Amino acid sequence: MAQVEYRGTGRRKNSVARVRLVPGEGNITVNERDVREYLPFESLILDLNQPFDVTETKGNYDVLVNVHGGGFTGQAQAIRHGIARALLEADPEYRGSLKRAGLLTRDPRMKERKKPGLKKARRSPQFSKR
């Protein structure tokens, strides 16, 4: 008999997370490492668990994540987005609560490109009067 699993893809900035939810005890594995070993800050782990708190499914699923690109914050938010999408696939009833919490919306903010003649995206070179 095939094991039931739900998949979701989450994105944020330059991070892409492929998430699989499998019925279990609530273990979270990121890139084949424990989440507490992979993410350095407790606040990111709390952020990542938000979809489970909203849907009251904490401890019902094991989470297997493959994530690449970006930094810790972007990756944590991409994982959160992927978990929310996978939960929606598991039970469409969760759509209302996930939508109200803003967890199904892909955050479109990206790093602004550097322009020629400027030091950064908007920072101009220092002006010297003389």
From Swiss-Prot:
From start to end residue, where is composition biased (Basic residues)? 111-130
Q: Name one GO molecular function term.
A: RNA binding
* Matches recorded under Pfam families: Ribosomal_S9
Query: A GO term (biological process) for this protein?
Result: translation
State the GO CC annotations: cytosolic small ribosomal subunit
Stretch list, region Disordered: 98-130
Q: Which UniProt keywords apply?
A: Ribonucleoprotein, Ribosomal protein
Under the heading Gene3D superfamilies, the entry gives: 3.30.230.10
Q: Which family does it belong to?
A: Belongs to the universal ribosomal protein uS9 family.
Q: What is this protein called?
A: Small ribosomal subunit protein uS9
What are the leading ranks of the lineage?
Bacteria, Bacillati, Bacillota, Bacilli, Bacillales
This chain is encoded by the gene named rpsI
